[in-house]
Amino acid sequence: SVARGALLTFNGEVEKKLARGLNLSAEAEVRMKEMTNFRPGVNHLKLIEVGTKLSYKICDYVKVGGGYFYRAYLKDGKESTGWENYWEHRHIVVVEAVASYKVSNWKFSLRVRPELTIRTDSICELEKVRNFAELRTRLQVEYDFASKPFEIFAYTEMFNTLNAIDPNETLNEVYRLNWEKNPGYSVPWSGQYVNNVRAAVGFSYRFDKRNSIKVYYRFDYDIGRDIHLNKNYANNFKEFTVTRENEFSHMLGIGYAYSF
């Protein structure tokens, strides 16, 4: 496992009530690189994300919605970019359902969110999925101090792949491209898997009916699977490796929300 330094992220949200139970929101996020690596004069952006979401409250216990997000990652330079930093772009489509239940000042909720991430960069589709689907499941608890404009919350979230590449199928294709006989070797890390586990704790403060802020700490444990094909000459893959790339990171988040 690889430990990453603390990250800093800023969130903003504007929400408009269109009709009874129907809301439209616009969201933005800016995430910085590890604070431990801060150096003056260096671009510390990690990603920028903007999007919009439409939600509808069916009843007191159930809300559904969907939206679109655009995400841009700032990557370190490589030889093909002249060692200049460059952007990678993603288009993300989400749908979600949230079930919630209140007990006194406590509120418990479960959110299920299928998510499709569309890549725009050049990739080898034997190594990576261009249109990557995953299922996010979040369990959250909140406590509202009724006499004060203050709320604390905690949640845990799990990400499951829905269409990850099966390394064994890739392996078969590699042997076919090499005109070799498949010796029956199988990769132990195949099929769908949990690729991220997330937990957070924080608080929110309401200035008035329209304005609020939140501050939170988040822990991420990423469970990656890297498929790599070594090319000895054009279109002839000779070596095939599958490795796990596990890493965890800490994040401090600050958010602002406005509703009207």
Label each region the model flagged.
Residues 1-67:
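Start-of-domain marker
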Residues 10-12, 50-52, 95-97, 137-139, ...:
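Membrane-embedded beta-strands of outer-membrane beta-barrel proteins
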Residues 18-26, 60-62, 91, 104-112, ...:
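Outer-envelope beta-barrel architecture signal
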Residues 35, 43, 72-92, 112-121, ...:
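Surface-exposed acidic loop/strand-edge motifs in secreted or periplasmic proteins
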Residues 39-103:
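Hydrophobic/aromatic-rich structural module bridging two neighboring secondary-structure elements via a short loop
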Residues 97, 246-260:
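Outer-membrane beta-barrel "beta-signal"
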Residues 107, 111-234, 258-260:
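Outer-membrane beta-barrel transmembrane domain signature
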